[in-house]
């Protein structure tokens, strides 16, 4: 069974994207193993502390390396991705040894699915920018560009803190789950 590492772009305890990930986890039951990446303790990228890498950075790099694939669930912040998610990707894109640009990074070639729950744009810009970032020549992740799922949250979600997916949204997620399982082989 394939191991998929879920990365939630929001660190909020009651994150809609964490709830979206839980929906996908249920759809993946008995088809893949799911683990959630805790990167809340990863420090801001700073070359002064890059070598040796902080323990939290070593841990997340190890988790990414162990996974067969990644699934990122992210909100959209100002037409892009959250800063702490970018910080994680910055750390994953850095060499493991000072001056060594030859050793592959844990994220190189990693198959990635993208989904998000948010406002009116349904995280379209966030997913576009993440695809652009993750496919840079030195990151070289293998992003599945179609299908992706963007959920436009209804007003009740924002006022009551509950995310209720429509049947159509659930079906879009199911299609993405099936496609991603095929994509990662």
Regions flagged by a language model, labelled:
Residues 4, 34, 112, 142-143:
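Hydrophobic/aromatic residues located in beta-strands of well-ordered beta-sheets
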Residues 5, 141-185:
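Glycine-rich phosphate/pyrophosphate-binding loop and the adjoining helix
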Residues 7-9, 37, 115:
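Short hydrophobic segments within beta-strands
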Residues 29-36, 139-141:
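A generic structural motif
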Residues 55-138:
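Helix-loop-strand module that forms the ligand-binding subsite of alpha/beta enzymes
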Residues 2-31:
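N-terminal beta1-alpha1 ligand-phosphate binding loop
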Residues 37-55, 154-158:
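N-terminal beta-loop-helix "entrance" segment that forms/cooperates
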């Amino acid at each position: 069974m394939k191991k998929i590492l879920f990365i939630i772009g929001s660190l909020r305890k009651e994150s809609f994207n964490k709830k979206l990930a839980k929906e996908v986890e249920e759809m993946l039951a008995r088809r893949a193993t799911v683990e959630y990446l805790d990167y809340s303790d990863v420090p801001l990228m700073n070359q002064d502390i890059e070598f040796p890498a902080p323990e939290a950075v070593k841990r997340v790099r190890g988790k990414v390396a162990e996974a067969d694939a990644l699934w990122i669930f992210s909100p959209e912040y100002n037409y892009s991705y959250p800063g702490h998610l970018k910080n994680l990707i910055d750390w994953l894109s850095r060499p493991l040894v000072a001056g060594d640009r030859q050793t592959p990074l844990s994220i190189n070639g990693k198959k990635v699915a993208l989904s998000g729950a948010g406002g009116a744009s349904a995280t379209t810009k966030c997913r576009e920018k993440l695809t652009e970032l993750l496919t840079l020549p030195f990151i070289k992740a293998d992003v599945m560009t179609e299908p992706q799922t963007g959920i436009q949250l209804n007003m009740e979600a924002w006022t009551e803190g509950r995310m209720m997916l429509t049947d159509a949204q659930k079906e879009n997620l199911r299609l993405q789950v099936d496609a991603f399982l095929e994509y990662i082989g």
